[in-house]
Design a protein with these regions (language model features):
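N-terminal beta1-alpha1-beta2 module of alpha/beta enzyme domains
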Residues: 1-60, 165
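Hydrophobic faces of well-ordered beta-strands that scaffold small-molecule active sites
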Residues: 3-7, 32-34, 58-61, 88-92, ...
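Active-site-proximal loop/turn and secondary-structure-junction residues that shape catalytic pockets
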Residues: 9-11, 38, 64-66, 94-98, ...
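Generic recognition of short, well-ordered alpha-helical segments
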Residues: 15-19, 44, 71-75, 182, ...
Length: 227
């Protein structure tokens, strides 16, 4: 079992408990996690922590997918991963309609479809096998809508990303757990009782079966939040 520290998002006044974070690193904690709601963001504090630590992994729990394009998130993740020597972990989530539609002003619908599209695009960017194209329900690259200029073209990231960058997703439902098992490297399950892992295991198994290769729990991390 690994231990992580969740510092969350900031209240009205921004501060970062670096003494606590450095103590956790000294005690052998494996990770520290930032968060966001509708105030401070998750990526900037992660960069701040990475710059002041040496060994501990730093991740986002979570970055809201509807708030950023997949390409922008990939750019942020690649940059943090490279600057930190591979210590950054990208944690993503769909958030909820109150925040997505009320704060970001975009439609919330079909969050699991968004998750699969989002991660597929990010992994394509990290792999750099070809120029990125995508046509899905939520995302189209290059954009070809009725208001498009027609000047967009497929691109490949200038920065060489690392496909080893880990991607976690948040889940509050069996379908969400299945989605995580299929497309992610780890999951933040909500309301998890360690003694009742049997509740989660069937959904993860369905996701693993849909993934490429012989994916299983040995290739996956379950990271519940405890208080």
């Amino acid at each position: 079992m690994k231990l992580g520290l969740l510092v969350g998002y900031s209240p009205a006044t921004l501060s970062m408990p670096m003494d606590l974070i450095k103590q956790a690193e000294g005690l052998g904690f494996s990770s520290v996690w930032t968060a966001e709601a509708w105030g401070s963001d998750a990526a900037t504090p992660a960069a701040w922590i990475l710059a002041q630590t040496e060994k501990i992994s730093v991740g986002t729990a979570i970055m809201q997918m509807p708030a950023r394009t997949p390409a922008m998130t990939a750019m942020t993740a690649m940059t943090l991963y490279a600057l930190s020597g591979g210590r950054f972990i990208l944690g993503l989530g769909p958030s909820g309609p109150q925040v997505v539609e009320g704060w970001h002003g975009v439609a919330y619908g079909r969050p699991l479809t968004r998750t699969k599209e989002y991660i597929a695009i990010i992994r394509n960017i990290l792999e750099r096998k070809e120029r990125v194209t995508h046509k899905g329900f939520h995302y189209e690259m290059p954009y070809q809508g009725s208001d498009a200029t027609g000047l967009g073209k497929p691109l490949k990231s200038i920065l060489h990303g690392d496909p080893a960058l880990r991607i976690f997703t948040a889940s509050i439902s069996p379908n969400g757990m299945e989605c995580s098992g299929e497309v992610a490297d780890g999951v933040f399950p909500v309301w998890m009782n360690p003694e009742r892992f049997d509740v989660f295991e069937p959904s993860l198994a369905k996701g693993f079966a849909k993934a490429e290769g012989n994916k299983g729990l040995a290739d996956f991390e379950v990271a519940p939040f405890v208080t």
